[in-house]
Each structure stands twice: as structure tokens, then as C-alpha cells.
A protein has these predicted regions:
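Short hydrophobic/aromatic-enriched beta-strand-loop microsegments
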Residues: 104-111, 128-131, 192-194
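Conserved beta-strand hairpin/beta-sheet module of binuclear metal-dependent hydrolase folds
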Residues: 17-74, 182-194, 199
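Short, acidic/turn-prone active-site loops that include or flank metal/cofactor-
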Residues: 59, 111-114, 196-198, 268-270
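Active-site metal-binding motif and surrounding structural segment of the metallo-beta-lactamase
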Residues: 63-109, 113
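Metallo-beta-lactamase
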Residues: 5-14, 59-61, 113-174, 178-256
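Residue-level marker for buried hydrophobic side chains located in beta-strands
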Residues: 53-55, 84, 107, 190-192, ...
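Binuclear metal-ion centers of metallo-dependent hydrolases, dominated by the metallo-beta-lactamase
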Residues: 249-285
Length: 285
């Protein structure tokens, strides 16, 4: 494994939390959701075989918590077959360097995310002027310089398959980031959405703290392409998922999920797109 891997110089612990922090939820027999402060990671696998895959890598300084969560489900010294990234924002790759060094495993992402994960390019800066709550206002403090995980990173197969996750396929869901992906399993309609949509109003400090469940579009302060975001939500809603784990907020399932997604598609411009902000295209809103 490549030893020359690092975070951007602005990477730091962010003192944000929620009542869900540290909680594990078994969503399906082989799908687990663990909340790290204000973001979710997913662990996919059969605890009886100790084989699993980690989806996303949490907040900065959370490696020990993620390793402990994995070992709680899959046994002491267990390690995933791979890490799959829905995208590369700081709260989804916050522990990736330590996890790579600890587990020595490959990491997969969409090819359009690779420049942000190999030190070549920074994401557009978060927008603290966007319409929204306190978290949006402080988003300028969030780490944004590119990380470099070098040769440990591989692009996802072009055929839509997901390494070490048989039955799942990856779906390109851009808008929040250029190479954002979601993961879907047809046999039980299980969806790992990433930040394509979330189940908490992520720009509101109060709602993040309390984890009040309500469907929303992607986090406003980081989303740069609202037209693509809307199309991505429509694409996921058309799959008619029966259970969804999102990057932020509690898992959602059944009638609540289907009705909420229908509402989000129908009223996306009102629910998701902010009235103002530097990435808002007035022509589509």
C-alpha cells in the first residue's frame, strides 16, 4: 500500500454532534448504519462470515470509532474487503487515511471523484451565504482541501458492479459532487443514497442535533449543481427503494420512504433548492 497518503492541510476535528452519534442501527440482516457525529457510514456484509464492505469513512479523527463499530458486528480484528466512497467531501473521508493504513485495503470511487481524492483538485468552496440554518453559516470552516490516497484508490468498474458487494450496483447521482454515487440492490430494493438526498435538514443545527426525520435534498452548503441534483433524486425515486440509508439522518423505509420521495420529486424546487446562494441558478428556480 502507498505510504505517501495524506489529508489536506485544513483537515481538523469538527466539534459537531447529534443525539444519534455513536448509535448502530441494523437496517437489514446484512446492512448496518453507524452514525459518526453527524454523518452515517454503512457496513454491508454477513456477521456470520465476518466479510463486509465499508461505505464512506466518517468525520475527521473517527478512525478508532469506525474500527470499533466494525469489530462489534464482524468480530475482533475483522477488516473490510474494500471501502466504497459515495463521494469525497471531508465528512465522508474523514478517517480514510488511518483506515487505509490500519486495514491495508483498496478504496473505490467514481472516476469523476478521483481528482479530489488524489490531491489534484479541491471541491468548490462551501457556501456560507446560502439560504439555510446555522450549519450552513459555519460551513466555511469545514475542511475542503483535497486529500491524497494515491495508489490505494481505484475507479469503480464501468459495468456498474460494486467490488465485493455482489447484488449491488452503483448509480451515478451527480449534483452534490460531480462523481457522487449511490448503491442499490434490486432483490430487496435497498438503497445507500449517500448525500443525493438526506433524511434530516442538514443545514439546520437544531434539526441535526435532534435528528428530526424529514426528507431533504443534498446538503445545501456543498451542492453546486441543482439541476443535476434534481435529476439524481428522480432517478433514485424511480427505483422505488423500500429502505434507504442516507449520508445524514436516520434510515427510512416503507410507506414513509415512498411517500417522502414522491414529495421530494414533486416539490424539489421548493424543498431542496435554496432561494439564494452562489450556486443557485435563478433560471431553474
Amino acid at each position: 500500500m502507498d505510504k505517501e497518503i495524506n489529508y489536506g492541510s485544513d483537515y481538523k476535528f469538527i466539534p459537531a454532534t447529534s443525539i444519534g452519534s455513536g448509535i448502530n442501527i441494523q437496517v437489514l440482516p446484512d446492512l448496518f448504519c453507524h452514525t459518526v457525529q453527524i454523518v452515517n457510514i454503512s457496513l454491508v456484509g454477513n456477521p456470520e462470515t465476518n466479510e463486509f464492505v465499508l461505505v464512506d469513512a466518517g468525520m475527521p479523527n473517527s478512525a478508532n470509532e469506525i474500527i470499533e463499530a466494525a469489530e462489534n458486528y464482524f468480530g475482533v480484528n475483522s477488516r473490510p474487503k474494500a471501502i466504497i466512497l459515495t463521494h469525497g467531501h471531508f465528512d465522508h473521508v474523514g478517517a480514510i487515511v488511518e483506515l487505509i493504513k490500519h486495514w491495508e485495503i483498496p478504496v473505490y470511487a467514481h472516476e469523476l471523484e478521483l481528482p479530489f481524492l488524489t490531491g489534484q483538485m479541491s471541491y468548490p468552496e462551501p457556501d456560507p451565504t446560502v439560504e439555510g440554518g446555522m450549519i450552513a453559516k459555519i460551513s466555511q470552516l469545514f475542511p475542503n482541501e483535497p486529500i491524497n490516497i494515491g495508489k490505494n484508490l481505484e475507479k469503480l468498474p464501468s459495468d456498474g458492479s460494486v467490488p465485493s458487494m455482489p447484488g449491488f450496483r452503483w448509480i451515478h447521482t451527480p449534483g452534490h459532487t460531480p462523481g457522487h454515487i449511490s448503491l442499490f440492490r434490486d432483490r430487496d430494493k435497498a438503497l445507500i443514497a449517500g448525500d443525493a438526498f438526506v433524511t434530516v435538514k442538514q443545514d439546520s443545527l437544531y434539526k441535526v442535533l435532534t435528528q428530526k426525520q424529514e426528507i431533504n435534498g443534498p446538503p445545501r452548503y456543498f451542492t453546486t449543481d441543482w439541476k443535476a441534483s434534481k435529476e439524481s433524486v428522480m432517478k433514485l425515486a424511480a427505483l422505488q427503494p423500500e429502505v434507504a440509508v442516507t449520508g445524514h439522518g436516520l434510515p427510512m423505509s416503507g410507506e414513509l420512504l415512498s411517500e417522502s420521495l414522491e414529495k421530494l420529486v414533486r416539490d424539489f424546487d421548493k424543498i431542496a433548492i435554496p432561494d439564494f446562494g452562489k450556486y443557485v441558478d435563478k433560471k431553474i428556480h
